């Protein structure tokens, strides 16, 4: 059995349709379990959009996220901040949201109830403000 067997079934990242053509706003839709074994595609998708001014990560299909996944999102957030961009989260489901609450990460990211709400907020709150839908 190859080391990659089953990983694609457990986790997927796709650039959501309608995210814009300028690459200024990129929507990454996550599905499945984000952990040490599956984090590679997320890192690759984030690296594929270096000119993005805003990345919205749609977590509505994310069923699990461990510390490796959280750290990848935190690193991407810092990289975007260095260039004046931002990374926002949308649609956290209860098990994933609980992990973000326990670690305090929910206070670091802008978190929206769903993707529609996140995309409607073009300006967004100032850093440090929480957004929960």
Tell me what each language-model feature is.
Residues 36-109:
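Amphipathic alpha-helical interaction surfaces in cytosolic regulatory modules
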Residues 2-7, 56, 64, 127:
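Intrinsically disordered, low-complexity regulatory regions of eukaryotic regulatory proteins
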Residues 2-44:
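STAS-typified acidic loop motif
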Residues 7-10, 113-133:
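Short, charged, intrinsically disordered terminal tails
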Residues 21, 80, 125-129:
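Alpha-helix termini
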Residues 18, 94, 116:
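Residues that form or immediately flank small-molecule/cofactor binding pockets and catalytic motifs
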